[in-house]
Amino acid sequence: MEELGVKRRIVLVPVPAQGHVTPIMQLGKALYSKGFSITVVLTQYNRVSSSKDFSDFHFLTIPGSLTESDLKNLGPFKFLFKLNQICEASFKQCIGQLLQEQGNDIACVVYDEYMYFSQAAVKEFQLPSVLFSTTSATAFVCRSVLSRVNAESFLLDMKDPKVSDKEFPGLHPLRYKDLPTSAFGPLESILKVYSETVNIRTASAVIINSTSCLESSSLAWLQKQLQVPVYPIGPLHIAASAPSSLLEEDRSCLEWLNKQKIGSVIYISLGSLALMETKDMLEMAWGLRNSNQPFLWVIRPGSIPGSEWTESLPEEFSRLVSERGYIVKWAPQIEVLRHPAVGGFWSHCGWNSTLESIGEGVPMICRPFTGDQKVNARYLERVWRIGVQLEGELDKGTVERAVERLIMDEEGAEMRKRVINLKEKLQASVKSRGSSFSSLDNFVNSLKMMNFM
């Protein structure tokens, strides 16, 4: 990296949410290993701690940014719009101060696509900027397509039950109802977000936490449409592991797993944002119990409306779960998926969880909640054929059957073979001369060109 001269610092700007923080910190680890200094610019909400895992990183907090109470009061979309409004000026000050203190050493600013306030600062200081997408390439394609649809016509289509089950033109095998809309706000708001992020996009390049062995056609579409270099350098959790959980992990579950039979356990975790009604949790508990399979269940505090944790659930729930299950508030997910006792993963299908499950060779039960999770679930079931998707209302019979299909049936055995094959391809992609390894090297070389042209 000596040839980079003094421009050896990369500034990272993450969205303050678990699913966005984790991959951008992994990206930071990967770039640090290439000889760059890393500065992470955070908001006051969900700040990453400067732990031993990131002791070589420099952390800055944008003054006056929003807090957790603002998120609760505004909701996710208004929060995001306001965050971009109020952070623009303070981020400019932050970058200006960095340039002054560090001797003009910034090679580029890498920002999460939803933190588009970064663009004003990089334009003012004439810095290279790189957009980082934490979702699949296919979900990125969907957002790009949706940013250009006729909003009025699309809203009518989405409200028509006859249309929602139809395949969306040009996005096979995705249906209208699989598109990345949100459970956290009206469709109009999500379309506005997509429009804002696309219209303001002036980045010199795009980094995606994916790999060509999973999404070659979507990556090719993006490379053609975006007209800037696209670098698929994932899966980052394999290429550059970097623990960055915003919740405390309960490691006692690993001891419980040690007592279970190989490939027998269903691991259930619905991510850091999904909410569940009591009736759905009871149907899950009954179905899991009736499947006669042991299960490890992550129930996140606050995920049950009106309850801090599980205390508001009926006694029947605790009895059902205690017979063959184990509940924790949060788990060390990659270690759990890697454990030989785990035979399946019931997931919300967030992109990080999807990559982690494939990366450990674990087939999935898919229950998407919002956004790009629906895209991922459809691909898991129909394209990669390593998942069983649960659609519609949950009932114990459907749950029991899904577990049986995954753990006991020949269908599940075939899924396991396919996911192990994908696991091997993912691992190969991040090794020397693999596609993602080479893509990261190409990105580093492009930074040299950005700073010496």
Swiss-Prot record:
Pfam family, one: UDPGT
Gene3D superfamilies given in the database record: Glycogen Phosphorylase B (3.40.50.2000)
Keywords on record: Glycosyltransferase, Transferase
EC number: 2.4.1.-
InterPro entries tied to this protein: UDP_glucos_trans
GO molecular function, one term: quercetin 3-O-glucosyltransferase activity
Residues reported in the UniProt entry to bind UDP-alpha-D-glucose: 272, 331-333, 348-356, 370-373
Family of this protein: Belongs to the UDP-glycosyltransferase family.
Function: Possesses low quercetin 3-O-glucosyltransferase and 7-O-glucosyltransferase activities in vitro.
Protein name, entry field: UDP-glycosyltransferase 76E1
Native organism: Arabidopsis thaliana (Mouse-ear cress)
Lineage: Eukaryota, Viridiplantae, Streptophyta, Embryophyta, Tracheophyta
